């Protein structure tokens, strides 16, 4: 299973930069956290349903078991 951070790096496609064990930037976009959960990447809002990613920038995250199948129209 990919971590939320790995999913976002694959979705946005930039070079990840880490600060300790937290993702700090993807390309030029700054990553923001609310507590321990991801909140924003650049201007794109990250939403959760329970403990799973639900939406990225308004695009729905579709799961097949423990793996992300699709985000919006982009397949993984």
Residue map of PLM features:
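Repetitive, compositionally biased segments used for assembly/scaffolding
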Residues: 1-76
């Amino acid at each position: 299973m990919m971590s939320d951070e790995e999913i976002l790096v694959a979705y946005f496609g930039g070079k990840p930069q880490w600060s300790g064990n937290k993702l700090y930037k993807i390309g030029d976009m700054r990553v923001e956290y609310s507590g321990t959960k991801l909140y924003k990447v650049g201007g794109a809002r990250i939403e959760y349903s329970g403990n799973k990613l639900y939406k990225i920038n308004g695009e729905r995250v579709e799961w097949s078991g423990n793996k992300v199948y699709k985000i919006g129209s982009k397949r993984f």
